[in-house]
Amino acid sequence: MFKAKVLVVGPTESGKTILANFISDATETIGGEYNPTQGVRILEFECPNGNKGSSCEVELWDCGGDSKFESCWPVIMKDSHGVIIVFSADIPSHLKEIEMWHLNFIQKQRLQENRCLLIAHKKPGSGDERERLNLSPALAKLTLIYSNLEDDPEDVRMELMKYLRGIVSSLSESRDREEMSIIT
């Protein structure tokens, strides 16, 4: 069974923990009092691998958004297979902040764009306007999904599972190539 390590990063109060809990089925509730993540939380769950009938164990690393944890980032990034950048579409400063997250967690790691996901998260009660976001050219290359767990939780789950299956598929192909190179 494959094991995929996916980081969930982004500015403080963007909804990273809510999304991590949601995708890993760690909790049923969506709302609640804000409690900032200290350092990192690791959630483990199985993700079915679509057409191959097998599954993959996913480690979802829910990373605290406070810059005081920056010294931990190299250790957190080590051996990661994917990065999800979460930001609040309701907080204008987040658009600028996610550029820093992209630089540190995607560009510096030289992660392929198909292993990255950008999520514009809407907090419960904030409406569902999907305004056009003014993203930098580097961020505009990433897949962007809008997340509103109140109105369309299954659409969000479907998009996240599609993203995770893509990572699992990449890992599988990589392993197959490695095995073939050993054989030949």
Swiss-Prot record:
InterPro entries: P-loop_NTPase
Pfam families xrefs: Roc
Binding site for GTP: 10-17, 62-66, 122-125
GO molecular function, one term: GTP binding
Key words, A-Z: GTP-binding, Nucleotide-binding
Entry GO terms, CC: intraciliary transport particle B
Naturally occurring in which organism (per UniProt): Xenopus tropicalis (Western clawed frog)
Entry keyword annotation includes GTP-binding: yes
Entry protein name: Intraflagellar transport protein 22 homolog
Assigned protein family: Belongs to the small GTPase superfamily. Rab family.
